[in-house]
Amino acid sequence: TSVSMTINGPAPIILACFFNTAIDQQMAKFEHDNGRQPTEDEAEKIREWTLKTVRGTVQADILKEDQGQNTCIFSTEFSLKVMGDIAEWFVHHDVRNFYSVSISGYHIAEAGANPISQLAFTLSNGFTFVEAYLARGMHIDDFAPNLSFFFSNGMDPEYTVIGRVARRIWAVAMKNKYGANERSQKLKYHIQ
């Protein structure tokens, strides 16, 4: 099961609730299967396994909130800090199957951007997250695989290649500018 959430300001709180619920469910499953509560060591292993296994995405792209929706509850600086806190927590707890932010061009397009502008703003926002996380001391290969992208679709011919162009630009920049490994060079995206 994969759970995707379109949340922004409340992202840290809802993510914490989601992860705690997933852990609680696994603890309850252990109790049901074994007829007892887990020991402290067993509980820690259950927590670690759950965080490594849980799958999903949280959109929480504050930059598109500002650019495409003009609905920021927090300042851009504070929001980037919070998203960096989430990415750092993911790194420290080995959360590898959950996308910490889905960088969204869809909302930028809905606000009037053409396909080329949507792509440019979205990739720029992606690199803004990368630079913010690197400035915190995180290593590129620890967080880049947990980024995903979201583009809009339409009838303009540019939409037919938006994904391929985005993947190429991202891969080249990640490899040549940031020295990222092959997994970090992969741009994962959804189009709607």
What residues fall within each predicted segment?
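Catalytic alpha/beta active-site cores
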Residues: T1-N153, E158-I162, K177-Q192
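Conserved, mostly hydrophobic/aromatic
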Residues: W170
